[in-house]
């Protein structure tokens, strides 16, 4: 199968390596021709230091590499999905399968990544999402990893499963692309919050409370938007939440630690030196919760800290002093 991975960051590069290991004809596209040339020469991506790129992997800065591609992976940062989607649209056909692996919600429109791709490509082809607890640093050295391929058309989800699955990269399928993509976006917000806890010196009890109650908020919003409850307890939901909230591979968590230590959100993102998706997702998730009338006190608190400069200690006190309630009812997780 001819596959093109659009976006040469760590995640796009790691996925291109998986596809190469599976014997596909793979090209990794970079928006920066100079970077593409450097990677082709050194067989290394600076985002994955010490990892040699497969000799079979072609690397290009020319969009013409998309001609004839059967599988196209959209692996750009969430803020670049719309612009890049417009650029690749002319190369897609009804037979192409387009897979979003970006994690986020678009600012202002509050669209999921697959929705943006479907819109800017004129729904010319099927769009799936691939997501789960999967740090690029670990996938690139072939650590056992599991993800979920999601598409309302299960045949498409299974095609993606077949393309990626091997003895170190296990892929499950799902029809719930809403739940999978929403989980991918919100876990970055929660990882930021967990990092703040670390930066302030809070310990395991606090982070367990945060992660569990955040999952309740995700489930409430996700079901309201059409997601399936079971998705949020699976790899794309709880699995990705755990790995992002507990690992120093997570730039969202690293940014949160700096905020907890007293840095501003902008200072923290500058110091991390990479895209902190949770910063942008926090605003979008807050807007979605307001639009849908879903109570999400944790996500609202993260939004207030990031965008309005509210003191972390003040939001912690406010959250802990909320009105008493039962944890569960017959119909919902409160």
Identify the meaning behind each predicted range.
Residues 1-52, 58-61:
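NAD(P)+-binding Rossmann beta1-loop-alpha1 motif at the extreme N-terminus of oxidoreductases
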Residues 53, 59-142, 160:
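Rossmann-like NAD(P)(H) cofactor-binding subdomain of soluble oxidoreductases
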Residues 105-203:
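Rossmann-fold dinucleotide-binding core
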Residues 187, 194-198, 223-233, 237-334:
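NAD(P)-dependent Rossmann-like dehydrogenase/reductase catalytic/cofactor-binding core
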Residues 205-208, 212:
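Ligand/cofactor pocket segment of small-molecule handling proteins
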């Amino acid at each position: 199968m001819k596959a093109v991975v659009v976006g040469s960051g760590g995640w796009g590069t790691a996925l291109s390596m998986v596809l190469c290991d599976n014997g596909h004809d793979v090209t990794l596209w970079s928006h920066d021709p100079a970077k593409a040339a450097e990677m082709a020469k050194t067989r290394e991506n600076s985002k994955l230091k010490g990892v040699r790129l497969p000799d079979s992997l072609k690397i290009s800065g020319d969009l013409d590499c998309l001609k004839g591609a059967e599988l196209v992976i959209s692996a750009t940062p969430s803020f670049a999905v719309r612009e890049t989607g417009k650029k690749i649209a002319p190369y897609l056909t009804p037979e192409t399968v387009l897979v979003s692996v970006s994690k986020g919600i678009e600012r202002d429109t509050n669209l999921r990544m697959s929705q943006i791709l479907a819109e800017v490509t004129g729904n010319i082809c099927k769009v799936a999402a691939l997501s789960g607890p999967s740090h690029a640093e670990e996938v690139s050295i072939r650590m056992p990893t599991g993800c979920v391929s999601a598409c309302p058309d299960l045949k498409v989800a299974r095609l993606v499963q077949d393309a990626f699955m091997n003895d170190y990269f296990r892929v499950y399928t799902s029809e719930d692309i809403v739940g999978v993509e929403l989980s991918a976006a919100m876990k970055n917000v929660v990882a930021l919050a967990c990092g703040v806890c670390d930066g302030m010196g809070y310990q395991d009890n606090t982070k367990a409370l945060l992660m569990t109650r955040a999952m309740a908020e995700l489930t409430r919003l996700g079901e309201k938007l059409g997601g399936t409850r079971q998705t949020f307890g699976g790899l794309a939901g709880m699995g990705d939440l755990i790995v992002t909230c507990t690992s120093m591979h997570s730039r969202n968590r690293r940014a949160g630690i700096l905020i907890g230590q007293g840095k501003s959100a902008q200072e923290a993102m500058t110091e991390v030196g990479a895209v902190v998706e949770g910063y942008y997702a926090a605003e979008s998730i807050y807007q979605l919760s307001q639009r849908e009338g879903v109570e999400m006190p944790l996500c609202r608190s993260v939004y207030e800290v990031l965008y309005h400069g509210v003191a972390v200690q003040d939001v912690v006190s406010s959250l802990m002093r909320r009105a008493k309630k039962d944890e569960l009812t017959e119909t919902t997780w409160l």
